[in-house]
Regions:
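Interfacial loop-to-helix transition and helix-capping segments at the boundaries
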Residues: 79-92, 158-173, 212-243, 277-300, ...
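Alpha-helical transmembrane segments in multipass membrane proteins, preferentially the mid-helix core
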Residues: 177-186, 243-256, 298-312
Length: 394
């Protein structure tokens, strides 16, 4: 009898210990606020995708849009020109969202090893998408001269090293970001400040000084050295945006704009218009992206918050967000020798832009016919067409 009582007490102690551990784990998770949910992530990716299409299609200097009628001039103000300049921030937006999303994804893991496993899986998944799309577009590219049928071209395309289709350059950058991601996230995980704005301001100041150095360094000579130099500073732009995304997740900056208090509405309005004014008026030249990493969270977080509160808009941007990777890889083929004659049918700039969205979305659905079952199989879900009309959720 006494032995039975002792066994029961021992079992109760184990249950209590397990329950206490579980409660402590839950408390740790709850202590890390996450105002930027998966729902917000899909909306933000949708916003970034549509900015990407607009900037690439309607920016000044493109030869393929010279025949588009610019109906977006109001009282002498060229809305098309300045909106295309502002939407240049889309490239930094992708790096920002990568940092924010990876922080939420990797912070739950305990070891660097587990973090790298997750990163490798993410990159392999992205390459699967890339290869499937490459198979679809390569035959047409041979006819139009975009690709050549030789070993060097094929190998460079397979590994996204170099290729005339410039939209693939982000593959190299994303790989580099994944290499550094676990280290940065582990570092930020252990840093704790009562005043969250102090480390943010210090970080911005250091990055801004480093970025300005480029204006005073001139590299000439070997083309490989020049290429590596440009690659380094391009990567610097995106590693900064990536780190800003980590900071936004670490300090829950989204809560500033999702707060139920009335002040959050005014913060959002001020932040959006300030970012537009700075990008379009204070930055000299469309290609000068020295402070885009500063502007991206000022615009992307509040605009995402606004959209999330409207059912129709949130559904639309969520749909685009689920196809964001396909959008990145596919949209360029409609204005780069592939189907420019089809894209130009509406004649007017805004209609051509809407038409590009429709064409890219239809193409993404077609790609997903092959892509979805492959990714499901890789994820040990078997071949099925569940989610046929949606991009695979991470």
């Amino acid at each position: 009898m006494e032995k039975t009582i002792k066994n029961i007490e021992s079992k109760n102690e184990k249950d209590f210990s397990t329950e206490t551990t579980l409660i402590n784990d839950i408390k740790k998770l709850n202590n890390h606020k996450q105002s930027f949910s998966l729902f917000h992530t899909q909306i933000a990716k949708g916003v970034a995708s549509l900015m990407l299409l607009y900037h690439h299609l309607l920016r000044e200097g493109n030869t393929f849009n010279k025949d588009f009628k610019n109906e977006l001039i109001f009282f002498g103000f060229n809305f098309r020109k300045y909106s295309a300049i502002f939407f240049k921030i889309t490239t930094c937006s992708y790096a920002f969202l990568s940092g924010l999303g990876l922080y939420y994804s990797l912070i739950k893991l305990n070891s660097i090893k587990d973090m790298y496993k997750k990163c490798i899986k993410n990159f392999f998944r992205l390459f699967i998408i890339f290869w499937i799309i490459l198979i679809f577009v390569y035959p047409k590219g041979l006819k139009t001269g975009l690709f050549n049928l030789n070993y060097s071209t094929i190998i460079s395309c397979i590994f996204a090293v170099y290729h005339r289709k410039g939209n693939w350059w982000y593959m190299r950058m994303y790989f580099a970001l994944l290499v550094y991601a676990p280290l940065f996230i582990r570092l930020f995980k252990d840093i704790s400040y009562k005043n969250k704005f102090i480390p943010i301001l210090i970080f911005y100041l250091i990055c801004f000084i480093i970025r300005i150095i480029k204006n005073y360094i001139k590299i000439t000579g070997n083309i490989i050295i020049i290429f590596l130099y440009l690659e380094y500073f391009t990567f610097l732009d995106f590693i900064i945006s990536f780190l800003v995304g980590i900071i936004a997740a670490k300090y829950d900056l989204m809560s500033i704009f999702t707060n139920t208090k009335s002040e959050s509405f005014y913060y959002s309005i001020f932040s959006i218009f300030s970012s537009i004014f700075i990008r379009c008026n204070l930055i000299t030249g469309e290609g000068d992206t020295r402070i885009d990493y500063f502007i991206v969270p000022m615009f992307l977080l509040p605009i995402t918050s606004f959209i999330s509160k409207n059912k129709v808009l949130s559904n639309f941007f969520t749909l685009i967000g689920k196809h964001s990777v396909n959008f990145w890889f596919l949209h360029g083929y409609f204005y780069d020798n592939y189907y420019l004659n089809i894209l130009s049918l509406p004649k007017y700039s805004s209609l051509c832009y809407i038409w590009l969205i429709i064409l890219t979305l239809i193409s993404s659905y077609i790609i997903n016919i092959v892509l979805v079952p492959i990714l499901n199989f890789i994820n040990n879900k078997g071949f099925n067409y569940k989610g046929f009309f949606h991009f695979i959720k991470k």
